[in-house]
Curated annotation (Swiss-Prot):
Residues 1-23 form the signal peptide. Accumulates in cell walls of etiolated hypocotyls. Keywords: Cell wall, Disulfide bond, FAD, Flavoprotein, Glycoprotein, Nucleotide-binding, Oxidoreductase, Secreted, Signal. One of its GO terms (cellular component) is extracellular region. Glycans are attached at N76, N164, N271, N300, N314, N400, N485. It comes from Arabidopsis thaliana. Its EC number is 1.1.1.-. GO terms for molecular function: FAD binding; oxidoreductase activity. There is a cross-link at H114-C177 (6-(S-cysteinyl)-8alpha-(pros-histidyl)-FAD (His-Cys)). It is found in: Secreted, Cell wall. This is Berberine bridge enzyme-like 9. Residues 77-252 form the FAD-binding PCMH-type domain. The keyword Signal applies. Disulfide bonds join C35-C99.
Length: 531
């Protein structure tokens, strides 16, 4: 017998004699899976083991990546969760919270996956993802003009259901992307092209059902007004899991009117600089039924401007308003398209009228995935023509970045900044979204696009809000600050930018409802004990 064979035999005999108590401990994912399976109460009609995906599950990566909306995080390098719980029952949420706390795992809550910097499905330490896509019911009461919508429902599903149930005479003020999940979109504010008429989504939310850090199911009455205040604009993921929202539906006319006018540079009779300057004068002051978004981009060293609008009424009334307030744009009858409000959802996606059925907004998986970076700003004073020319020059040198100017005013200026946790109200003319998209992998391309975004962002600093330089929570931007140790000092860096003076109230509420800071992530609200 050779020496190697003898050694192998000895090792084998030794291993066979080891007591079972010395066997390898179960993996963390096994312990978590067992913990949630043993949790009581449970729903025998929806056993949680049918909704748990660990890294050994054959479709783990499919479930994880189905709601990754930024290809920057769609790779083998990002840390993967210990498990994904695709909750289909409230007991699944309670079990996930209880077991994550017990095992010291961080929790990431994902409804639509549109967190621009991936904070709903990424972490630097062991974590689990609570995926809400199975919880998507929408119960509409047409008599009361209200609806209960679960967090996993998309805006497209909500819009489609509301329009069908109301004979196209009701809508809801929220985002223009139908794939957004209600959970995160609403809790960060929820803005869209009816905000000048009706405010944000949170201004039309009248109740919520949540699961708190103790696993309790609460509504507005039992959670208290302070927590309900925080959920509306403060980012619910810092406080609880939102199971469902009760929304107030709003009237929409039988027909709305949309248009999109594009200009290129300053050539001939077209002067983009003058048009943008005039847009600044009127966009936040014009009729509340009219929303005109201005998007600026550049190609071939020429700035392009897009004036995309929606009027809650017919084209004749729209033209009267435009001829009186913005004749320089030159909007004419044939450029105005009348359609149902539900059809306008597709128009804002860039889909030509009549080329796709409204059911297409029910598609949950986008046809095209992209790499992206987003940032935000608020403008409170008009940018001078000299300033605009300077900005245009920088844009021609950084052509991978666009800016969308979204006008405020109207209802947005009437609601006090302390009415909800969302503080950006009166005094803001418009909000800017910086957007860089790219379509090929590689570090060099990503670095170039990120650098271009940062250069434009820095160049805009003289023209935007200051002390703090305000930011919009739903345009998640890790560059403005993050908390690695969950301290107040770290949290206030980004907290005052997102929430201004409302940040201090959010910290107090957080400290009361989640003193152990279970619900935390890189930009969560800190607790006072960390002060």
């Amino acid at each position: 017998m050779t020496s190697l064979t003898t050694q192998t035999l000895i090792i084998t005999i030794f291993l066979l004699t080891i007591p079972t108590s010395f066997a390898s401990p179960p993996s963390l994912e096994d312990v978590f899976a067992q913990c949630v399976t043993d949790f009581k109460p449970s729903n025998p009609k929806s056993p949680i083991q049918n909704y748990i995906y660990t890294q050994r599950s054959p479709n783990f990566l499919t479930i994880l990546n189905n709601y990754v909306r930024n290809l920057r995080y769609f790779n083998n390098m990002t840390r993967k969760p210990v498990a994904i719980v695709a909750a289909a029952d409230v007991t699944h949420i309670q079990a996930t919270i209880t077991c994550a706390k017990k095992l010291g795992l961080q929790l990431r809550i994902r409804s639509g996956g549109h967190d621009y910097d991936g904070m709903s499905y990424l972490s630097t330490i062991d974590f689990v993802v609570l995926d809400m896509f199975n919880l998507r019911s929408i119960n509409i009461d047409p008599k009361l003009d209200t609806a209960w919508v679960q967090s996993g429902a998309t805006l497209g599903e909500i819009y489609y259901g509301v329009a069908n149930k109301s004979n196209d005479l009701r809508g809801f003020p929220a985002g223009i992307c139908p794939g957004l999940g209600a959970g995160g979109h609403f809790s960060g504010g929820g803005y869209g092209n009816m905000m000048r008429k009706y405010g944000l989504s949170i201004d039309n939310i009248i109740d919520a059902k949540i699961v708190d850090a103790k696993g309790r199911v609460l509504d507005r009455s039992s959670m208290g007004e302070d927590l309900f205040w925080a959920l509306r604009g403060g980012g619910a993921a810092s406080f609880c899991v939102v199971l469902a929202w009760k929304i107030k539906l709003v009237p929409v006319p039988a027909k709305v009117t949309v248009f999109n006018i594009e200009t290129f540079g300053n050539t001939g009779s077209v002067n983009t600089t003058e048009l943008v300057a005039k847009w600044q004068e009127i966009a936040d002051k014009i009729d509340n039924d009219l929303f005109i978004r201005l998007t600026l981009g550049s190609s071939n060293k020429t700035v392009k401007a897009s004036f995309m609008g929606m009027y809650l009424g017919n084209s004749s009334n729209l033209l009267e308003i435009m001829n009186a307030k913005f004749p320089e744009l030159g909007l004419i009858k044939r450029e105005c398209i009348e359609m149902k409000w539900i059809e306008s959802v597709l128009f804002w996606l860039g889909i030509p009228p009549g080329t796709a059925p409204t059911t297409s907004m029910l598609n949950r998986i986008p046809q095209k995935q992209i790499y992206l970076k987003r940032k935000s700003d608020y403008v409170q004073k008009p940018i001078s023509r000299t300033g605009l020319e300077s900005i245009f020059k920088i844009m021609t040198e950084n052509e991978n970045v666009t800016m969308a100017f979204n006008p405020y005013g109207g209802r947005m200026s009437e609601i006090p900044s302390t009415e909800t946790a969302f503080p950006h109200r009166a005094g803001n003319m418009f909000k800017i979204q910086y957007a860089a998209n790219w379509f090929v992998p590689g570090e060099a391309v990503a670095k170039d696009c990120l650098s271009q975004t940062e250069r434009l962002f820095e160049a805009m600093s003289p023209y935007v809000s200051k002390n703090p330089r305000e930011a919009f929570l739903n345009y998640r931007d890790v560059d403005i600050g993050k908390s690695l140790n969950s301290t107040y000092e770290e949290g206030k860096v980004y907290g005052f930018k997102y929430f201004k003076d409302n940040f201090e109230k959010l910290v107090k509420i957080k400290s009361r409802v989640d003193p152990d800071n279970f619900f935390r992530y890189e930009q969560s609200i800190p607790v006072l004990s960390s002060h």
